[in-house]
A protein has these predicted regions:
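Catalytic glycan-binding domains that act on GlcNAc-containing polysaccharides
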Residues: 47-215
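Generic detector of intrinsically disordered, low-complexity, polar/charged segments
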Residues: 7, 19-21, 35, 98-101, ...
């Protein structure tokens, strides 16, 4: 064997090793982009299927958060339920007024606010029952009414239905066999229960850590 042949043969293993490393590099070079593309596709699918927190909060906004939080704490009501009622009652329009005479954010009837004040459930000295276009006052009376209903009824569905149709009517429906939702005879109340329940779940999903107090 010549010295040249020996040297040539001696180099072959190294050459093969370099070629193997090169093939490994190019293999990873081709695979990594595919992995990245797959990861991006999965992320996009997740984002498309599950709205981001920002998108959800656009669908379920909050205004007058400090007033809601304060009244909810004072009366022991979930502030997110208050927000859901406001969204469905007035869509956050503090100047809203119905043909029936319901006023403001939570569409409180003047006779309801007067009765709540008479019962001592709201401090009428601090919150004038006739000033229902004022957001702070309206939220206080609307939240106090939710608290009153919660103390006299046994489920959130009952409370929501009673906020729309009145507690007496809900008690009539409850006296019948079957589920409340099946016994509701007012189409408006049936739809109201569906909408507020959906909004309530939407607010809970959008604010998992509770109401964000921002003005």
């Amino acid at each position: 064997m010549s010295s040249r042949t020996a040297r040539t043969r001696g180099r072959r293993p190294h050459a093969r090793r370099h070629r193997t490393r090169g093939r490994g590099f190019w293999r990873w070079y081709r695979v990594v982009p595919l992995v990245l593309v797959g990861a991006v596709a999965i992320a996009c699918a997740i984002l498309a299927a599950t709205p981001t927190t920002l998108a959800r909060r656009t669908l379920y906004p909050v205004s007058h958060a400090q007033d809601i939080q304060a009244s909810a704490e004072r009366h022991g009501v979930d502030p997110l339920l208050v927000a859901a009622v406001i969204k469905c009652e007035s869509n956050w329009d503090e100047n809203a007024q119905s043909a029936a005479g319901a006023i403001g954010l939570m569409q409180v009837m003047p006779q309801t606010s007067s009765e709540l004040a008479r019962m001592g459930l709201v401090d009428s000295g601090a919150y004038d029952p006739s000033n229902l276009f004022d957001p702070t006052t309206n939220i206080e009376y609307g939240t106090a009414y939710l608290a009153f209903l919660e103390k006299n009824l046994s489920s959130t569905d009952q409370v929501i239905a009673a906020y729309n149709a009145g507690m007496g009517k809900v008690e009539e429906w409850l006296a019948q066999p079957g589920e409340l939702a099946d016994n509701i005879t007012y189409p408006e109340t049936r739809e109201y229960l569906r909408r507020v329940s959906e909004a309530y779940q939407g607010y809970r999903d959008s604010y998992p850590n509770g109401l964000v107090v921002e003005q």
